[in-house]
Amino acid sequence: MELIKALPEIFEDFAEQRKKSFLTMKELKDRDVPVVGAYCTYFPQEIAMAMGAVTVGLCSTSDETIPVAEKDLPRNLCPMVKASYGFAVSDKCPFFYFSDVVVGETTCDGKKKMYELMGEFKNVYVMELPNSQSETALKLWKEEILKFKSYLEQTFKVEITEENVRKAVHMMNENRIALKNLYEVMKKDPAPMNGQELFNVLYGSQFRFDKEKVPEEINALREKIMKEYEENEKMPKKKRILLTGCPSSGAPMKIGRAHV
């Protein structure tokens, strides 16, 4: 499979941060690093990482490209689906553009239709995600993961070994533990930082491609936060608002910014 390395024609029209993201991805591709994009947190990224690929989330939370998407999709469809499709079809998302394979899943009818249309201009692999928790569902999901592994091996002409899968699992577990420990500093009352600051760290960590460095940096950040919390004046107590859902970035974070 030939990796995508060229920049899109509309590159020069992008804002500075988006240009930076494109160039970061371009550097990876120039080193022959495959990129696998996904739209669901259930995506078994460790399987892709075990073959040396970089993984990245693709769900869009900006309404910028919804008008583009509505040329193909119904106006009353989910905004997240339309935004994601709009960024994909317009080449405005650096992560989608440089993804050699996009992994979808059967979480909703809107996304299934989106993947169908995306398949006309991108390599799309759809995983059957069970919608219940049972022995049968677990068996199905295990089979789906093994099928995905075989697909990557055939597509990229590589062998994904158990040893490399275990290494990837260990690395991602270290990431999750570090992020969980950071999240738990918010148990303090008053909180040592506002929710927007915490979210920026959690969300930004998803777009770090040097995953092996993330735990150490997150742990160092946690220590710094706690040291300053003990030594400096505390923030005033405020009401706490719980934001849930996935994805929770972009437009939903207006609530967080409004209460900083």
Go through the PLM ranges and name each one.
Residues M1-E162:
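Trp/Phe/Arg-rich N-terminal binding region typifying the photolyase-homology
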Residues M1-P34, S150-R257:
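A charged, amphipathic alpha-helical module
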